[in-house]
Structures are given as C-alpha cells and as structure tokens.
C-alpha cells in the first residue's frame, strides 16, 4: 500500500446525474423475453443492479425483498425447487457475507439452480469497507457446486448472463457496471464457462487477469513489449471451475507468471492459479497483483487502485521482478 495525495474528487460521486449504460439489465430483459421461468429478486437496489427494466416490464416476475439478503436467498432457493430460475441481485459484499449461510445451505448444498448477481466488486465503490467486496471470490470458491464468473467488462456481460442461465446449477456472477457506452468498434467477447480466453500472445511471461484488471494487464503487456518483453495475457473469466489444463500449459511454456485481480490476494484468482499449478507439480511461484492482507478505505476507484497497488505500472514492476527469477519448465 502506497501513500497518495488526497483530493476532494476522490471522495465525490462524479456520476450522480450521469446516465450509465445498463448492459446487464438489457441482457437480463432479453433473456426473460425468451424464457418465462426467469424471475428476478432484489434487495431494495433495483436501479444500482439494473433490475428496474425487468421490474417495469415483468412486475409479476419481479420480487423486491427489502434489505434482507438472507431471506431473499432462501426464497430464491424455494422458487428454484418449484422450477423457476431465480436471478438474485444485490451488491457483492451483501450477497456473500450477509447471506453466506443461506447461500451455502440452501443454494450450494442442494445444487439449486439459483443465479447470484453481485455488483460493486472489490475497489469499485467509494463507500468504504462496509461495501467493498474484497473477499467474495474466496468465499464463493470455497463452496462446493458453486460456479464463479467475473466478465472482463461490458463487452462480455451479455455472454456471461446467457452462460449463467445455461449452466445447470448455482452461479455467482461478479459484475462491474459500465460507466460509458461501448464504442462501435468494440469486439463483443464470448464467455465459455471453464475456458480461459487468450487476448495476447508472447513467450516471455504470462499474466492471468480477471474483471477490470484485464485491461490493465493488456496495457502492461504493451509497455513491456516496448522493452522487448513479449507477454501472453489471459482473461480468466471463470474462476471456478478454472481451466487448469490451459493454465498449466501456458505457464509451462513461458516459465514466469503473474495474476492480477480486483480482490484480496488471499483466496482469489492467484490462489486458484497456484492450486492448478501445484496439483500438476509445476514448481513456479505465482506472483500476485491484488489487495494485500488488509481492508481498504473509502475513495474513488482510480484513487483506490493506485493506493493499493492495482495499477498498470504495478503489473509492469511485478513482471520485471519475476522475469529475473524465471524458470523454464520442461
């Protein structure tokens, strides 16, 4: 964690009056048009979770449950047993910490076909420690039967929602809301559960990233390329079940690796990659860019990412360090 200069803008919500794109809400709406079994539950957060589209069009399939996440998850489990496909919405931290026992006992254990949709992952909220989900991936990874997905950005949300729907069982979908419209030349990304996506190829180093850290990993790879270091960048959108076979193959080829995540380095992507390598007896240290063993503080996302070492330059610095210790695996 580094010292940073504080500015008023770092503690001010700049998008209060801004029209924010609603890629998730539109994707859920389109899905609901085709499948009448889909129902939506919300913990008094319809606009922030983009479920107001669904509420206004399908009021008889929308259930506002109040700020009672544990009860909401229990209700969703019962609805799933009756044949509905519940999409359950709140902020990541509330779905995971507050309702964890219900998620474990009423969703994961019976393999209920419930889709848990969490917003405000990691350091993407200025509301401080009570709203920052820095351990949600760790909590959900630990649950048997739970699928954990984090799309890289708005260009992958539609595919992520459809993949979650098609998955037979519980899914935790970790979403960061888009702040701007996608440009017309943005390539829409497909999401195949359990399969990584290689976005850049190189022989010197491999960076595994998820969520908003993918773009920072790609920017870091470009900077490294200018110094003659060619990097493979991998979008690990499915953290569980993870694509261990491809991960091991890529690391064995490059011999040096970094993970980058908007999450604690404990229990998240870094641990998942380490586990995959360890089980194949690949003896390479996984160098991690993420939140160290600490809580965060309030502030804007750029301020927090800089303070806690999750910026592009942090990935570059970590890459230069790990390359000095590179081991080629045969």
Q: What label would you give each PLM region?
A:
Residues 1-174, 179, 190, ...:
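Thiamine diphosphate
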